[in-house]
Structure formats: structure tokens, C-alpha cells
From Swiss-Prot:
Homodimer. Found in a mRNA decay complex with RENT1, RENT2 and RENT3B. Interacts with KHSRP. Interacts with CELF1/CUGBP1. Interacts with ZC3HAV1 in an RNA-independent manner. Interacts with DHX36. InterPro entries: CAF1_poly(A)_ribonucleases, Nucleotide-bd_a/b_plait_sf, PARN_R3H, PolyA-riboNase_RNA-binding, R3H_dom, R3H_dom_sf, RBD_domain_sf, RNase_CAF1. One of its GO terms (cellular component) is cytoplasm. The modification Phosphoserine is found at residues 523, 543, 569, 573, 575, 605, 609, 613. GO terms for biological process: box H/ACA sno(s)RNA 3'-end processing; miRNA catabolic process; nuclear-transcribed mRNA catabolic process, nonsense-mediated decay; nuclear-transcribed mRNA poly(A) tail shortening; poly(A)-dependent snoRNA 3'-end processing. It comes from the Eukaryota. Residues 171-238 form the R3H domain. 3'-exoribonuclease that has a preference for poly(A) tails of mRNAs, thereby efficiently degrading poly(A) tails. Exonucleolytic degradation of the poly(A) tail is often the first step in the decay of eukaryotic mRNAs and is also used to silence certain maternal mRNAs translationally during oocyte maturation and early embryonic development. Interacts with both the 3'-end poly(A) tail and the 5'-end cap structure during degradation, the interaction with the cap structure being required for an efficient degradation of poly(A) tails. It catalyses: Exonucleolytic cleavage of poly(A) to 5'-AMP. This is Poly(A)-specific ribonuclease PARN. Belongs to the CAF1 family. The gene is Parn. Its cofactor is Mg(2+). It is found in: Nucleus; Cytoplasm; Nucleus, Nucleolus.
Length: 624
């Protein structure tokens, strides 16, 4: 079901009903871009730590807009042994509620827009008909403004006891307004008077003056023309009629506030249900959803984890599930489209699914990929097929595994990390995996270097894997850890490049953080303000500059790599990543404190809980 601004309110009860009845939900988002700086390859480095990946996405991806949100609710019909679905495709856009409401700035990435356009995406439905939204802080501020405005209006009695001080340059204007109102009140024919459009300050003076001069007998309100011009309308009313109009105005303003909260109400309903939320490669979806509809992401990864669990108590990533035993050996491609096709084949059994009455059905043969509602739908199908496969391995077999089964608990709250070679997931409920990286080197070099140059440099060390960090640094993984020190020693006298172990790289990075923290703790803010920003002794991955050009060194790339394209041509789009990625693929690819988290937890009456007891049969491995 397509939901835009014009039909959002009339269909909101259907959305709430679907959420209330569902066993679980599948979600998906479409964005205005992926990365505002580094290429997608650099954004998803193969040796990122979970903290580094979070910081990269937070810094380079959150200024894009999630402008289409897909939600598919799944409910199992025990009578007919089938899943009944209700799919929604929401177009979302942060249209300002009023002149005082947030005017959101966002960025677009040309490759992402071009790709969505090629898929038939209707951008007019976003920008002309998108559903507005507010995050919790924006909603709170608007409600405070509304309450303050009403208290000022209701407190006019206090102001009415004394005349209003009118600036000299506005006295003539106010005198003319009072003269018009006096003539209006003397007239028996006119029931209302429209004043000419004026400034906000002049309207305020009019309100205050009329509250003092005419405490009874008139009703004053501000209306807006089609040209967005605001003017005051004055009506003759008795006290009973005045109170009735004031109540109507209050009700209308409350309704407009709820309309401004808009799509966020759907996210709040999903969160408050406490039910399982399924996504595919869903880290960005979760980050954008929290960032846009709740609050800006915290600076610290651990705070983000708390916040994510607070908003969505149970998350499951089908990409991680498909990349884990017992699926890993029988599923070769975990991109969403290919996964959906594979799960229709032996040994899997595709589920029986039917759309609820009044909801359009999707045909997987038509492959409406990159429509968020359709992607959410097939994500849910993939989850059901894999969950039922786990059930088929039991003795006796269980043909239908519910969203509350302990069989799938090992996959809860672990989000797939794209292209990280040895850390498959971000663990929202505890510490992340810390693999040994004693076979990994950190290399800095001139920005002219290409992938082929690195392959030649390490040609004596056998098979290697390269993961670019930026234009002047990369991680190189050797096949044998004992060769690491040899490689480091060979670079001691090199002028154009530098090699250090992964442990040394991390140590210097931590040292830099400690120095930076010490400056803050010692309150050297005055010094910092008076002179240009100076970095601590941290060894930055992009700080190495070659003493000279390559000079007479002649690079002869290994024949195996002769066909390699230049580094610049290796950037790939998000859609290409989705087509080729796997967790073992060697290809490179305002802070809120705990008080705010507690307040969020209090505001969100989250139903349901995640059991701490692990499943016995299947476990997401601690090592990869």
C-alpha cells in the first residue's frame, strides 16, 4: 500500500492495526546517498573495527535523507498454514510544519539518485507528497512553543491590566488599527473584519493591544493566504462563542502538531510493540531511522548500542543469518535478490504467503527491487525460509518456526558489517569480537600509488589481501603472520613508504586519543582557541608525505595484476556492493548522555523482552 502525505492520516489506523496484529516486521529504506566524502570502498574498509565503522557511517552517511521507508507486517494463519502480509511503502520528506519548525538540510549523491531514477523511482512523490516527521527533541520544542503561546494568550488577563508599551515608530500603525476596529464595532452589518497583512511584531502588538482594550466581545485569530501572507481576522462574538472558538483553535493546533510528528508515529508504534524487526544488511537502516525519527546519533558506539536496543529491542539481519552456519556452505551469494532466489530451491522450502484483503500483492517474478516496500517484503520471505530450514533440522522436524522461537535467538541484535574480513557483525547486546590481526600491516605511501604498486611491493610474500583506507594508506593482510616482522624491517630505510604492524598502528592511534583527551581534561580551551588546531603525536594513517617523487624506481606489476584498473576506477556503487559482497570477500570495500537514554526508555513503553538463554542447536560464531 502506497502511503503519501495526502492519505497518511486516513490510513494510519490500518498501519497501527497491522503493527498490533503482526508476529514480526520486515523493514527497508531508500536513501538520497551513501557517502558524502570517501568512496563506498573506503567507507567499508576490510579491517574496520565496529567503532571505526560506526564513526565512518555517522560522519559520512547521516546527512543523507531516508526518503522511502518500507514496512511489511507478517502474521501466521494457523488455520490455513500460511503467512498473511500487509505491506506499506511510505514516502517521507521533512516539510516544515511552521516558520518556527526545523528547516532540515540534507545532501544528495548523484550516483544514488541516478541509480534510483533508473529503477523508476518517483522523486515527485518524495518532494511534493512526502510525509513530514519530527524527531523527539523537535517535537518537544514545538510543543513547548505551543504551550508557551497558549499560556501567553490565556495570560492576557495579566497583560490586560496595564496598557501595552508601543514603540514610537509603530504608534501610527496601531492607532489606525484601533480606528478600524472602532468603526467595525459600531457597524451592525459586519460580523468580521480582515486587517491587512503585517509583520509578526506588528501582529503581536495588535494582540496585546486588543487584549487590553477589548477584553470581551471579540475573537482575534491569524489566518494565512494561499500566498503565505499572514493577516489578522477579528470577529464579533459573545463569551460562549469566544470560548468555543478558542477550543476549536486548540484542537486544530493539536491536530497540526500530530500531523507534524507525522511518520515518526509509525516508528514509535513499531518500537513500542517490542516485536522482532527484520532487515537485510540493516545497519544503515537502523542508524538512519534512529537519527531521523528519534534523535541525533551519539558520538560513542556503546551509547548507540543502548539507544538501538531501547528503540528496537529485537533486531535480526538476514544477511548475517545467510552468512552463518548452517547457511554459509549452501548460500553463495547473500545479496537480497540472489538470496530470495536461492531460498526457493532445495534444500529450502518457500513459505506460503498471501496478502491481506485490501492490500496489493507483490510478485517476486517482477523483481520490483529498490522499492522499499517490496524489498521489505522479500526480506521477510528470506527470514521465514531460513528460520523454517533451521526447524527442519530438528528431531522431530518443525516445519514452521515462529519469530519468538529460541532457534533464531542467536541472531538477535547482531548487525552485519559489510566487507569486514574478520568481524562479521556489530553486537548490540555486548562487546564486539576482537580478532587477532597479527598478520595485518598498515602501509602509508604517496597518493600516486595504485593497487598494482602494493602488489609489487609485497610480491615476495605470496598471497595478500589489500584493504584501502584512503589515498595514502591501506591495510595489507599477509598469509603467514611470521612474515610480518620481515616486511616491517624491509621498510626501515625506505623513503617513499612506511610499514608498521597493526598493533603499532592501533597503539599510536590510542596514544593520539589520550593526548587529545588530556587537552580537554586540562581545560586548555583558551590556548586552543587562540591558535590553529594542532594535532597530538598520533600517527595518522593519512599523514605520511613522501620526501620526493618516485624518482627512478620502475614499477613492474606482477603479471597476475597486469589487468588491474587504477585505484580511482575501483569505486563501486552501493548497488554493485550489494550484488557482490560477502563477509569473506577480499575486495576492499550532538552527543546524547545516559540521561537522555533513560528518558527515552521511560518514554518508550517497550513491550517484549529478549531472552538471555542461548539456543542450543545453532550459534553465531565468536570467531569467523
Amino acid at each position: 500500500m502506497e502511503i503519501i502525505r495526502s492519505n497518511f492520516k486516513i490510513n494510519l489506523h490500518k498501519v497501527y492495526q497491522a503493527i498490533e496484529e503482526a508476529d514480526f516486521f520486515a523493514i527497508d529504506g531508500e536513501f538520497s546517498g551513501i557517502s558524502d566524502g570517501p568512496s563506498v570502498t573506503a567507507l567499508t574498509s576490510g579491517f574496520d573495527t565496529p567503532e571505526e565503522r560506526y564513526q565512518k557511517l555517522k560522519k559520512h552517511s547521516m546527512d543523507f535523507l531516508l526518503f522511502q521507508f518500507g514496512l511489511c507486517a507478517f502474521k501466521y494463519d494457523h488455520t490455513d498454514s500460511k503467512h498473511v502480509t500487509k505491506s506499506f511503502n511510505f514516502y517521507v520528506f521533512p516539510k516544515p510544519f511552521s516558520r518556527s519548525s526545523p528547516d532540515v538540510k540534507f545532501v544528495c549523491q548523484s550516483s544514488s539518485i541516478d541509480f534510483l531514477a533508473s529503477q523508476g523511482f518517483d522523486f515527485n512523490k518524495v518532494f511534493c507528497s512526502g510525509i513530514p516527521y519530527l524527531n523527539q527533541e523537535e517535537e518537544r520544542q514545538l510543543r513547548e512553543q505551543f504551550d508557551e503561546k497558549r499560556s501567553q494568550a490565556n495570560g492576557a488577563g495579566a497583560l490586560a491590566k496595564c496598557p501595552v508599551t508601543i514603540p514610537e515608530d509603530q504608534k501610527k500603525f496601531i492607532d489606525q488599527v484601533i480606528e478600524k476596529i472602532e468603526d467595525f464595532l459600531q457597524s451592525e452589518e459586519k460580523r468580521s473584519l480582515e486587517l491587512d497583512p503585517c509583520t509578526g511584531f506588528q501582529r503581536k502588538l495588535i494582540y496585546q493591544t486588543l487584549s487590553w482594550k477589548y477584553p470581551k466581545g471579540i475573537h482575534v485569530e491569524t489566518l494565512e493566504t494561499d500566498k503565505k501572507e499572514r493577516h489578522i481576522v477579528i470577529s464579533k462574538v459573545d463569551e460562549e462563542e469566544r470560548k468555543r472558538r478558542e477550543q476549536e483553535k486548540y484542537t486544530k493546533e493539536q491536530e497540526e502538531l500530530n500531523d507534524a510528528v507525522g511518520f515518526s508515529r509509525v516508528i514509535h508504534a513499531i518500537a513500542n510493540s517490542g516485536k522482532l524487526v527484520v532487515g537485510h544488511n540493516m545497519l544503515l537502516d537502523v542508524m538512519h531511522t534512529i537519527h531521523q525519527f528519534y534523535c541525533p546519533l551519539p558520538a560513542d558506539l556503546n551509547e548507540f548500542k543502548e539507544m538501538a536496543i531501547c528503540v528496537f529491542p529485537r533486531l535480526l539481519d538476514t544477511k548475517l543469518m545467510a552468512s552463518t552456519q548452517p547457511f554459509k556452505d549452501i548460500i553463495n551469494n547473500t545479496s537480497l535478490a540472489e538470496l530470495e532466489k536461492r531460498l526457493k530451491e532445495t534444500p529450502f522450502d518457500p513459505p506460503k504467503v498471501e496478502s491481506a484483503e485490501g492490500f496489493p500483492s507483490y510478485d517476486t517474478a517482477s523483481e520490483q527491487l529498490h522499492e522499499a516496500g517490496y524489498d521489505a517484503y522479500i526480506t521477510g520471505l528470506c527470514f521465514i525460509s531460513m528460520a523454517n530450514y533451521l526447524g527442519s533440522l530438528l528431531s522431530p522436524p518443525k516445519m514452521c518456526v515462529s519469530a519468538r522461537s529460541k532457534l533464531i535467538e542467536p541472531f538477535f541484535n547482531k548487525l552485519f558489517l559489510m566487507r569486514v574480513m574478520d568481524i562479521p557483525y556489530l553486537n548490540l547486546e555486548g562487546p564486539d569480537l576482537q580478532p587477532k590481526r597479527d598478520h595485518v600491516l598498515h602501509v602509508t605511501f604517496p597518493k600516486e600509488w595504485k593497487t598494482s604498486d602494493l602488489y609489487q611491493l609485497f610480491s615476495a610474500f605470496g598471497n595478500i589481501q589489500i584493504s584501502w583506507i584512503d589515498d595514502t594508506s591501506a591495510f595489507v593482510s599477509l598469509s603467514q603472520p611470521e612474515q610480518v616482522q620481515i616486511a616491517v624491517n624491509t621498510s626501515k630505510y625506505a623513503e617513499s613508504y612506511r610499514i608498521q604492524t597493526y598493533a603499532e598502528y592501533v597503539g599510536k592511534k590510542q596514544e593520539g586519543k589520550q593526548v587529545k583527551r588530556k587537552w580537554t581534561e586540562d581545560s586548555w580551551k583558551e590556548v586552543d582557541r587562540k591558535r590553529p588546531h594542532m594535532q597530538g603525536p598520533c600517527y595518522h594513517s593519512n599523514s605520511f608525505t613522501a620526501a620526493g617523487v618516485l624518482g627512478k624506481r620502475t614499477l613492474s606489476p606482477d603479471p597476475r595484476e597486469a589487468a588491474l584498473e587504477d585505484r580511482e576506477s575501483e569505486e563501486v556503487s552501493d548497488s554493485e556492493l550489494e550484488q557482490t559482497d560477502s563477509c569473506t570477500d577480499p575486495l576492499p570495500e550532538g552527543r546524547k548522555k545516559s540521561k537522555k537514554l533513560k528518558r527515552m526508555k521511560k518514554e518508550l513503553s517497550l513491550a517484549g523482552s529478549v531472552s538471555d538463554s542461548p539456543a542450543v542447536l545453532f550459534e553465531v560464531p565468536d570467531t569467523w
